[in-house]
């Protein structure tokens, strides 16, 4: 987990510890744009939907693709009337850097769709 907010980092550390996942999840407090690959290969990167509310979304995605080794990327989005509740991600921007693989739309009471992309 890469997070720049100290409060979010501390909450995340507490959650990871409570779940007993310290050996599986690493938390780094830093700004993502100054974070460079640490030689790890990641199976998946999960992009927080708040990323798409910032003005530097493209810069962040470009940095991710150029500097982090990963196979897949999961993104939460919304479609249709659900956009009244949440911001839809810019899929065209994502497709500029990543290859779309799968879209899972909600069933029953689930609000969000999940997009799966692969690293090109």
What feature does the model see in each segment?
Residues 5-7:
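Conserved SAM/SAH-binding beta-strand->alpha-helix loop
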Residues 34-39, 54:
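Short conserved loop adjoining the S-adenosyl-L-methionine
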Residues 21-32:
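Conserved SAM-binding strand-loop segment of SAM-dependent methyltransferases
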Residues 12-13:
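Conserved SAM-binding loop
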Residues 16:
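Conserved hydrophobic residues forming the short capping helix/wall of the S-adenosyl-L-methionine
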Residues 42-57:
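A short SAM/SAH-binding and catalytic strip from SAM-dependent methyltransferases
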Residues 57-111, 118:
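C-terminal substrate-binding/active-site "lid" region of AdoMet-derived donor-dependent transferases
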Residues 1-3:
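Conserved SAM-binding motif I beta-strand of class I
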């Amino acid at each position: 987990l890469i997070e720049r907010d100290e409060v979010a980092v501390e909450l995340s550390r507490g959650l990871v510890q409570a779940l007993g996942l310290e050996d599986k999840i690493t938390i780094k407090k830093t700004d993502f744009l100054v974070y460079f690959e640490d030689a790890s290969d990641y199976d998946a990167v999960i992009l927080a939907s708040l990323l798409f509310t910032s003005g530097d979304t493209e810069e962040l995605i470009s940095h991710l693709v150029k500097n982090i080794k990963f196979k897949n990327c999961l993104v939460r989005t919304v479609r249709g009337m659900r956009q009244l509740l949440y911001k839809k991600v810019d899929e065209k921007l994502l497709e500029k850097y990543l290859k779309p693989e799968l879209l899972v739309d909600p069933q029953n009471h689930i609000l969000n769709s999940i997009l799966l992309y692969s690293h090109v």
